[in-house]
Each structure stands twice: as C-alpha cells, then as structure tokens.
C-alpha cells in the first residue's frame, strides 16, 4: 500500500565505478516501512550491455560477475536502461509517491551517480536526501568497533541480495549502535 513513510532501497551492479565510462549491469529495489520491515521486492533487472562494454571491465568485476552469473544474464537480456528505469518506476509508484522517499542503500551516492547519468527519470523519483547505511558502518568502525563482528555479509554482488543485506545491517545498527529511547 502506498505510504509517505515507506522507504525505497536500491542497488546497482555496474561494470566499474566511473559513470563516465562504466555502465549499469543490474538494478533491484525493495520497499520497507519506516521500521525497516521489508514489505515488497521490486523487479530484479539485468540490463544488456555490448561485448565491447563488458570487455572494459577490470579483472575483479569480470571474476565476480562471471562467478555470480550476472555477465551471462546481461548478455541474454533485451532490456536497456530506459526500459529498466520505467519498470522500476512502475513498481515504486505502487508503494511510495514520487519525491517522498530518500534513496536508501549502502554507498548509495555511487549508485545515484549512475542513475543520474543513465536513468535520470528514475533518479528524479527520489527525494534529494539519502539514507546511506555506509555512514553508520564508518562511524561504528571508528566509535564502537566491537559491534562490527556481528555483521555478516555474503558479498554475492547480486543487487537484491545486497539490498537485503543493507536493510539487515541498518536493523543491526539500530539495535547495537544507535541509542534509541522512547522517552524522547
């Protein structure tokens, strides 16, 4: 059900980290309520990229995305960025009005750079604010490093898996790092 308080979580897998030369391989979204309960998972979309573009990937990306099957999905996909953005927006419209949810995820400013470049209509669907779990990760690592042992990640580098891990990580920080009080 549509709500102003729902949060949009997104993750992209890319050919690299430079939006000037690299491209989006996969996009996934999910919706949580304000209490971080996952209430809907959006489409997981592999985006076709040319062989020339795939050959520009560094060895790390080739190794990871070959092992997780993403390169093969990208080769078989018929979707381009515009179509993937439209399908994602169609899902988001069922859950959150445009301009209301911050963009949520891990190192989300990196994903936003790619959205701005290749899926500007989707990027504009988000509020200008962001909810970046990596901020809490960096603070916890410095201020309360012992809690970091409680965070378990598979590092599958599949977009939907990564988003689920981001939500779980924020739930963990809420319980073990943030001091929440009902008296305030």
From Swiss-Prot:
It is found in: Cytoplasm. It is an enzyme of class 3 (hydrolase). It holds the Pfam family RNase_T. GO terms for cellular component: cytoplasm. GO terms for molecular function: 3'-5'-RNA exonuclease activity; nucleic acid binding. Transmembrane segments: none annotated. InterPro entries: Exonuclease_RNaseT/DNA_pol3, Oligoribonuclease, RNaseH-like_sf, RNaseH_sf. It comes from the Bacteria. Its EC number is 3.1.15.-. GO terms for biological process: DNA metabolic process. Residues 7-170 form the Exonuclease domain. Keywords: Cytoplasm, Exonuclease, Hydrolase, Nuclease. CDD domains: Orn. The active site is at residue 128. NCBIfam families: PRK05359.1. Belongs to the oligoribonuclease family. 3'-to-5' exoribonuclease specific for small oligoribonucleotides. This is Oligoribonuclease. It comes from Baumannia cicadellinicola subsp. Homalodisca coagulata.
């Amino acid at each position: 059900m549509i709500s102003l308080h729902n949060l949009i979580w997104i993750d992209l897998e890319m050919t690299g980290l430079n939006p000037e030369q690299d491209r989006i391989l996969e996009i996934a979204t999910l919706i949580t309520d304000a209490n971080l309960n996952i209430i809907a998972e959006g489409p997981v979309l592999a985006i076709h990229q040319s062989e020339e573009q795939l050959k520009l990937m560094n060895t790390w990306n080739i190794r990871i995305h070959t092992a997780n099957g993403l390169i093969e999905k990208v080769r078989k996909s018929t979707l381009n960025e515009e179509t993937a953005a439209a399908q994602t927006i169609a899902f988001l419209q069922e859950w959150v009005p445009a301009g209301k949810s911050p963009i949520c995820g891990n190192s989300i400013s990196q994903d936003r750079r790619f959205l701005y470049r290749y899926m500007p209509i989707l990027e504009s669907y988000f509020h200008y604010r962001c909810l970046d779990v990596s901020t809490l990760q960096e603070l916890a690592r410095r201020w309360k490093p012992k809690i970091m042992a409680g965070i378990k990640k598979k590092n599958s580098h599949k977009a939907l898996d990564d988003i689920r891990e981001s939500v779980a990580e924020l739930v963990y920080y809420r319980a073990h790092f943030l001091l929440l009080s009902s008296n305030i």
